[in-house]
């Protein structure tokens, strides 16, 4: 499957506005493609910080709720120009759970620059089910 990264970035730029970030204002949006279907998520902060939901896990929940279990592509959009943004450890483990060897992950900054990773590059020696 060929992806249109320009279109995906435009979608994520619209979706990221839905993030609920009253504490950090660090907005993140995620699009997952699984079996040619798209699933979106945004980060949702909570005054009890451990309850905060990351955009990646939000998108995974949508995907699983729709009956899908294998991620083909992950696009994570950050509202900063940090150049070193990437999923947190908890999200990396969750992404690994539903990824396969060919899963591709893109980390995109708000200037549309991006870095591409494989799931193994993102989480080397991750804990996998047997």
Curated annotation (Swiss-Prot):
GO terms for biological process: cytidine deamination. InterPro entries: APOBEC/CMP_deaminase_Zn-bd, CMP_dCMP_dom, Cyt/Deoxycyt_deaminase, Cyt_deam_tetra, Cytidine_deaminase-like. Substrate binds at residues 43-45. GO terms for cellular component: cytosol. The active site is at 56 (proton donor). The keyword Cell inner membrane does not apply. Its EC number is 3.5.4.5. This enzyme scavenges exogenous and endogenous cytidine and 2'-deoxycytidine for UMP synthesis. Homodimer. This is Cytidine deaminase. It comes from Mycoplasma genitalium (strain ATCC 33530 / DSM 19775 / NCTC 10195 / G37) (Mycoplasmoides genitalium). The gene is cdd.
